[in-house]
Amino acid sequence: MESNDIIYQTVSYIARHFREEMSLERMARDLGVSRFTLSRVFSGTFHRNFNQFLNEQRLNYAAIHLECSDESITDICMNAGFESQRTFNRVFRERYRMTPREYRILYKEKYLREEQT
């Protein structure tokens, strides 16, 4: 498999499966490549490791749902593929410098201000 094919397959696979329990080993097996090859794709192409890339996809999903839905934060966390609310809160805070609850409140306040102008 060519490098560009592996990159495409990797992005496509994660887009389809990020909400499920996932590991580098399982993904490599499903794509028919070695763990080492897949690990090189993440570091060389995306400049991050597998878990960092996966968490980014999950956080993007969660942020959209925090902004646009009234789902509970726990439901959003679980639907995004995080195994625990504790992990979700930690990873979310690392990226956004606030809790998911604070993010939701901030976004809704911003949205209300924009509607009033």
Q: Where is each model-derived feature located?
A:
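Terminal helix-turn-helix DNA-binding modules in bacterial transcription factors
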Residues: 8-16, 21-25, 44-83, 105-117
